[in-house]
């Protein structure tokens, strides 16, 4: 409980600056990086339907260690989803420390954003909004995977037919949140050196472009794949 209080106040009981917020920031970054990488892999995985149902089922079989046991061990993907869910909830808890605590703080930040018109601040705003949406949407999706049994192309196609709007929205939320998060991780943890501030800003913009292009391309492919899922 003491560590929890220190994490929010930033001070220890003796008045000295606590290291807890820094530790929480580090773990927030680690869990965020894991989830952002998982989203990249997830988009590639779901997009294999573009190569046909057999290709998708083959990837599922590989993930379920069919090459080791001779048959698909379906519970492996459920365990992976459970681990990702734990990482996801941990990341959400750590990230909520920086969310507006009440409506007044929400209005203050929105006014601050509108006055500054600073791109990185606006990006954080989108990350905040998509993070809030993902807390519910991604949780529902992961819980469905954890308790949904064996995954195959036919079962996934049925799910897309029933919840096509949900999956489209989930894709948008994931891509926006993860791409902004990866860019912010780069800015936060990677040293950006330069002769002057213009060179530093140029390097930062280059990193931003690379991150957004990677996620953007995979998102477009995944979006096309979503329409293919619906057509099956």
Where are these regions (language model features)?
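Membrane-embedded alpha-helical bundles that constitute the cytochrome b-like, heme-associated redox core
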Residues: 1-232
């Amino acid at each position: 409980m003491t560590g929890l209080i220190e994490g929010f106040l930033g001070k220890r009981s003796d008045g000295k600056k606590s290291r807890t917020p820094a530790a929480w920031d580090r773990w927030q970054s680690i869990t965020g990086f894991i989830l952002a990488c998982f989203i990249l892999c997830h988009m590639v995985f779901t997009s294999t339907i573009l190569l046909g149902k057999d290709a998708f089922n083959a990837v599922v079989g590989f993930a379920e260690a069919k090459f080791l046991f001779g048959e698909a061990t379906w519970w492996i993907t459920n365990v992976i989803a459970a681990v990702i869910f734990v990482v996801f909830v941990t990341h959400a808890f750590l990230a909520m420390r920086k969310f507006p605590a009440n409506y007044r703080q929400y209005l203050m930040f929105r006014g601050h954003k509108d006055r500054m018109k600073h791109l990185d601040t606006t990006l954080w705003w989108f990350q905040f909004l998509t993070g809030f949406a993902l807390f519910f949407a991604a949780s529902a999706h992961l819980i469905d995977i954890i308790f949904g049994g064996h995954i195959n192309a036919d079962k996934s196609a049925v799910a897309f037919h029933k919840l096509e709007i949900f999956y489209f929205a989930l894709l948008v939320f994931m891509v926006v949140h993860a791409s902004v998060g990866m860019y912010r991780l780069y800015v936060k943890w990677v040293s950006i050196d330069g002769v002057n501030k213009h060179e530093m800003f140029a390097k930062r913009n280059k990193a931003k472009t690379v991150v957004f292009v990677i996620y953007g391309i995979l998102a477009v492919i995944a979006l096309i794949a979503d329409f293919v899922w619906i057509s099956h």
